[in-house]
């Protein structure tokens, strides 16, 4: 009977999508929209890299697909944004150090302040020392082991079906995305 039939195994694919609009303002010392970039590095990309590194260290057989948009990828290798990211992390460490002192007589708050101080110091270590401010290399390292599959998307993160009224625009979006990916990751993308 049908109910006794063994179900076939399949695959579930989780695809993480990493994107930020391109923001770079050398004309300003601080620019609010750039904070999104720094926060994404501290709160998302480095925690993922730490997880990938830990899985590799523990010998876990894992697979994940992640898209990194051309705008984000190019921001991640930009020297100005890399230096500003270091300054952002340094400010977080300074604030956390002050919080540890301020909360020294409040155990429950002090524990949290110390946790954040440790987290931000680890973030600085991973970003500056371990990966030389280049998170593309961190992601590429895991792609080169076959565990992480990095794909791209349209060059400006545009929705290609809506661009089909101008076929040359679609071709340009894909061509630029593939060129950017190849330059940064050393091979053509296997997906978009």
What are these regions (language model features)?
Residues 2-192:
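Carbohydrate-active enzymes and regulators
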């Amino acid at each position: 009977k049908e109910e006794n039939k063994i179900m076939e195994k399949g695959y579930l694919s989780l695809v993480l999508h990493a994107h930020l609009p391109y923001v770079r303002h050398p004309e300003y010392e601080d620019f609010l929209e750039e904070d999104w970039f720094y926060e994404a590095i501290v709160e998302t990309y480095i925690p993922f890299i730490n997880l990938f590194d830990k899985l590799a260290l523990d010998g876990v057989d894992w697979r994940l697909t992640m898209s990194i948009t051309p705008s984000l990828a190019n921001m991640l290798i930009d020297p100005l944004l890399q230096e500003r990211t270091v300054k952002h992390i340094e400010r977080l460490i300074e604030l956390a150090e002050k919080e540890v002192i301020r909360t020294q007589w409040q155990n429950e708050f002090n524990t949290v302040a110390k946790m954040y101080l440790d987290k931000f110091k680890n973030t600085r270590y991973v970003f500056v020392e371990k990966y030389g401010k280049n998170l593309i290399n961190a992601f590429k390292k895991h792609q080169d082991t076959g565990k992480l599959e990095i794909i791209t998307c349209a060059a400006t993160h545009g929705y290609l079906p809506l661009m089909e009224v101008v076929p040359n625009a679609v071709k340009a979006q894909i061509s630029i995305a593939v060129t950017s990916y190849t330059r940064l990751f050393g091979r053509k993308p296997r997906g978009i």
